[in-house]
């Protein structure tokens, strides 16, 4: 179908030289991209018995919770609602979580009442969580060291059933922006290094501190850096195959 469209010189695609996918022969090939109109053209070329299946598959793409919540994270910035978020408070973190996961999780913005664990690490017990969150909220956040410590403690608390990392990284950036006039360019922090540092942080936060310090930028109103940061934040949460 791709070749047929190209022969007909339709407005089709560009080569995505940075994105290669594995084909059935086991080799990786550069991919083509089309817009909505191009997709409809492709469907029209497919034999009718198969076109409905293909169309249903296409409509299902981009519909995961991650994709939808990422779009909401973009909108949080684009709409200006991010400027209404309480900075450095539990309520502020709940506001972020409620916005980017609203309509996707029933518990969006709600503090969990159940115990959770990940990778063998148990986060703050639910029965003590409210007290822990009050203590974290009252932690000082005037310097980078203090802000990173507060971020680490909030990660250990993990106040939501799901979506903690994505929400808390935005929360961290707002604190940095308010108190030291910087925020993190997450594209400068390697995924493996970040995840390793966060695993170590309950015992030793020096590694995550150095990663964050090395990725700080003064360009706090740069839309591109923020949007790229959202992409990297969601990338950190993806399970590597």
Predicted regions and their residues:
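FIC/Doc superfamily catalytic core
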Residues: 23-35, 40-241
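Major-groove DNA-recognition helix of helix-turn-helix-type DNA-binding domains
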Residues: 1-23
